[in-house]
């Protein structure tokens, strides 16, 4: 049984489906959760669900100073889950420089800053668990998402580099790469679109946010102390690497 009692976890993008599921599970396993996102109303709603042992931190990841402050405000930090991300999809020949830049800035650069600042804090205690949420398309690519795919592939490379740098300090750094997970976005697909995607998934169904949360919880636990620099794929077999 995973026990995170006494641990403090920071989850970005906690106002979304996957982030919320991660926050709820880590809280259930005993961790104090710092739930962060840009939508305060949704964070307050999540707070009502977990009820206690939580802190809300509204943060705009496009503001690098806010990224740094998000970490510095945590008096204690054992687990960092970088889940927040954005998309701005279009074919590369139509993609504006600013559309590429804003996705890289939030999905990759902001997460680098969060990782870096968290490591500074974790080194003091010689303990830490960092889990960066990538995506299946960071490995496979996807048409119309050159910016998003680049950012998610970058997270995987960054994670590997950081894991080397901090391995002797009791800190592990890993990535979880979800496939097609049920969300507001997938709910908007029509039946034909859903069937086309499901046909590509050997397990024959979408994943649930909780599937991703369980992978994160394992990597955040002491049971995963010998795992670092790895990418855990949660995609129903859609991509086997």
Swiss-Prot record:
Active site location: 148 (proton acceptor)
Pfam families given in the database record: adh_short_C2
Keyword check for Cell cycle: no
Catalytic activity: a (3R)-hydroxyacyl-[ACP] + NADP(+) = a 3-oxoacyl-[ACP] + NADPH + H(+)
Gene Ontology biological process: fatty acid elongation
A Gene Ontology molecular function term of the record: 3-oxoacyl-[acyl-carrier-protein] reductase (NADPH) activity
Listed InterPro entries: 3oxo_ACP_reduc (IPR011284), NAD(P)-bd_dom_sf (IPR036291), Sc_DH/Rdtase_CS (IPR020904), SDR (IPR050259), SDR_fam (IPR002347)
EC number(s) from the headed UniProt entry: 1.1.1.100
Annotated positions binding substrate: 135
Highest taxon, organism lineage: Bacteria
Residues the record lists as binding NADP(+): 13-16, 38, 57-58, 83, 148-152, 181
Family matches, as SMART domains: PKS_KR (SM00822)
Alphabetic keyword roster: Fatty acid biosynthesis, Fatty acid metabolism, Lipid biosynthesis, Lipid metabolism, NADP, Oxidoreductase
SUPFAM superfamilies with a match to the protein in the record: NAD(P)-binding Rossmann-fold domains
CDD domains membership: BKR_SDR_c (cd05333)
Pathway participation: Lipid metabolism; fatty acid biosynthesis
Family named by the database record: Belongs to the short-chain dehydrogenases/reductases (SDR) family.
Subunit structure: Homotetramer.
Designated name of the protein: 3-oxoacyl-[acyl-carrier-protein] reductase FabG
């Amino acid at each position: 049984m995973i026990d995170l009692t006494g641990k403090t976890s920071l989850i970005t993008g906690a106002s979304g489906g996957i982030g919320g599921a991660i926050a709820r599970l880590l809280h259930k396993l005993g961790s104090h959760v710092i739930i962060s996102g840009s939508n305060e109303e949704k964070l307050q709603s999540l707070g009502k669900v977990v009820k206690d042992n939580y802190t809300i931190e509204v943060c705009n990841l496009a503001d690098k100073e806010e990224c740094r402050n998000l970490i510095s405000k945590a008096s204690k930090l054992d687990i960092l889950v970088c889940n927040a991300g954005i998309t701005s999809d279009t074919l590369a020949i139509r993609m504006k420089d600013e559309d590429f830049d804003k996705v890289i800035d939030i999905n990759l650069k902001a997460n680098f800053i969060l990782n870096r600042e968290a490591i500074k804090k974790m080194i003091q205690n010689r303990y830490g668990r960092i889990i960066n949420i990538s995506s299946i398309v960071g490995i496979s690519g996807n048409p119309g998402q050159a910016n998003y795919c680049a950012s998610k592939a970058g997270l995987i490379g960054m994670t590997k580099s950081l894991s080397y740098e901090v391995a002797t300090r009791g800190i592990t750094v890993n990535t979880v790469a979800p496939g097609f997970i049920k969300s507001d976005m997938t709910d908007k697909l029509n039946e034909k679109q859903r069937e086309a995607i499901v046909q590509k998934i050997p397990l024959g169904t979408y994943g649930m946010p909780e599937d991703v949360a369980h992978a994160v919880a394992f990597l955040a636990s002491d049971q995963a102390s010998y795992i670092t620099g790895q990418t855990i794929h949660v995609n129903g077999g859609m991509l086997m690497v």
